[in-house]
């Protein structure tokens, strides 16, 4: 004869086997909260994505109702769960040397500058973009101390931790030349075969920190020669996009460059920036 499960285990089993309900009201509240905290606009067709990502948080916390989860969040505005909430709903699509036409532009710009060349990757995700910037600058300017620096930020603390670790599958580095792979990465052996790690010499030139682009001021060591803010504005509404772009203005050095994603058009949003090349912008008063 099988003995009955304790009540707590029965509840947990039900959570695992039954689909929790996400009401219209709770979905709308989630959309409001992520907009307030991160500026991210969630359309109705993102509902399944929201459900699938947040239901993991509920199960981790032993909750069986979205209303209870939202009440827990709103009861403590300083709760660490807010960061987990943001991390769950941010999208991180990236690759080494994504939108490859930007990197020769960066290299040529760096060659013409004097002093330490400083770049900010404003949506660093898991590190592929800032390390691509670092490789480009190392190939162009060398590795002498004080010659260049990459500052990398993201709102998602989990992806920043992966970026700091600098470990990737080797098949993710197909866009690198064999020389770059050998010069800037160490290959894993034994149980780590198929993985690579960024060499410390390169990693030392990249600094990671959490930054929320919704903040009125950015705690970043500007001004910069170049800012990469690619494929992140698409998640914000027009007013938020305009506010972010205007905050970039004092963070660019004279004749500095702002790089956008392939589907983003910054010159249509604010007068402060004008197109210089394919999704490359400069301050309008400096337009050639």
List each language-model region with its residue ranges.
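Residue-level signal for inorganic ion chemistry
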Residues: 106, 227, 252
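Extended basic-aromatic, gly/pro-enriched interface segments that bind polyanionic ligands
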Residues: 146-228, 232-240, 265-267, 285-287
């Amino acid at each position: 004869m099988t003995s009955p499960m304790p009540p707590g285990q029965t509840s947990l089993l039900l959570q695992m086997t039954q689909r929790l309900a996400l009401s219209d009201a709770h979905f709308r509240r989630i959309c409001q909260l992520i907009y307030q905290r991160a500026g991210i606009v969630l359309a109705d067709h993102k509902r399944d994505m929201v459900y699938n990502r947040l239901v993991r948080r509920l199960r981790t916390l032993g909750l069986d109702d979205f209303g209870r989860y939202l009440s827990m969040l709103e009861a403590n505005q300083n709760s660490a769960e807010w960061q987990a909430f943001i991390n769950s709903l941010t999208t991180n699509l990236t690759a080494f040397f994504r939108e490859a036409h930007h990197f020769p532009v960066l290299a040529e710009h760096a060659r013409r500058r004097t002093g330490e060349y400083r770049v900010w990757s404003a949506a660093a995700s898991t590190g592929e973009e800032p390390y691509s910037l670092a490789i480009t600058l190392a190939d162009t300017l060398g590795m002498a101390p004080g010659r260049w620096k990459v500052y990398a930020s993201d709102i998602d603390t989990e992806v920043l931790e992966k970026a700091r670790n600098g470990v990737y599958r080797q098949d993710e580095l197909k866009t690198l030349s064999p020389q770059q792979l050998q010069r800037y990465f160490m290959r894993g052996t034994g149980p780590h075969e198929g993985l690579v790690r960024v060499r410390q010499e390169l990693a030392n030139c990249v600094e990671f920190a959490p930054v929320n682009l919704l903040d009125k001021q950015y705690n970043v060591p500007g001004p910069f020669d170049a800012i990469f803010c690619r494929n992140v504005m698409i998640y914000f509404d027009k007013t938020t996009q305009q506010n972010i772009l205007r905050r970039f203005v004092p963070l660019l050095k004279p004749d500095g460059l702002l790089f956008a994603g392939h589907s983003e058009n910054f010159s249509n949003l604010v007068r402060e920036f004008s197109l210089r090349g394919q999704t490359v912008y400069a301050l309008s008063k400096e337009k050639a």
